[in-house]
Amino acid sequence: MEETKTINIPVMADIFPKGEKPEFLFWVGCAGAFDDRYKKVARAFTKILHHLNVSYAVLGKEETCTGDPARRAGNEMLYQMQALMNIETFTRYEIKKILTICPHCYNIFKNDYPDLGGKYEVIHYTQFLQKLINENKLKIDSSILKDNHITFHDPCYLGRCNNEYDAPREVLNRVSTKITEMKR
C-alpha cells in the first residue's frame, strides 16, 4: 500500500478554481480516514480510480461528518447542521455524483439528504466496481484468490436499508470461487 502515497489525489479546493469539474466526488468518510483497516479500502479504491483514469476528486480538509451518527443518536439539530453544511459544499463544487466506501455514508446521502435538498447520484464502491467489471473496464485476475475462502456479511446499511445485495457478491465471485454467507 505504500505506493498509494505517490498517487496525486485531486482535491476539489485545488482543481475547481482552475475550471476542473470531476465526474465524481469520492467521499472517504470517517472509517476511510481514521480506521486503520478501512484506510486500506480507501487506498485500494483510490488506486483503482487512478489506474482507470476515473475523473474524481476528494474534499480533503473540507470533508466533515455526514451527520449520520448525530441522527442515529437522536440529535436531529446537529444532523441537519452537518448535512446542510455538506450540501452547501456540494453545491459550491457542483457535485452531482458521490462515490463512497462506507455503507452509512451511502445510506444517508441517498435516503436522508434529499429531504434537505441534497439530491445526488450516490454509488457504493461495490456497485461502481461491479459496473466496471461488467463493462470490462476492470479486469480481475481471479487466480490470485481462487483458493482462498471468503466469508461475507452484508453491511446493514447497504443490504437491509438499501436492498443492495448483488454488487458485493458479484465482485467477490469474480475474485474467489469459495464464498460463504455468514449466518443471520
Where are the regions a protein language model picked out?
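Short, structured coil segments at secondary-structure junctions
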Residues: D115-Y120, V175
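Iron-sulfur-cluster electron-transfer modules
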Residues: M1-I101, Y106-Y113, G117, L132-E135
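Short hydrophobic/aromatic-enriched beta-strand-loop microsegments
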Residues: G118-Y125, T180
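Redox cofactor-anchoring modules in respiratory/redox and cofactor-processing assemblies
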Residues: N134-R184
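Short, catalytically relevant binding-site loops at active-site mouths
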Residues: C105-N107, F128-K131, Y157-R160
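Short, acidic/turn-prone active-site loops that include or flank metal/cofactor-
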Residues: H124-Q130, R184
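Conserved active-site and cofactor/substrate-binding residues in soluble primary-metabolism enzymes
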Residues: K40, M81, Q127, N163, ...
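Short, structured patches in soluble enzyme cores that scaffold and shape functional sites
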Residues: V28, H124-T126, D154
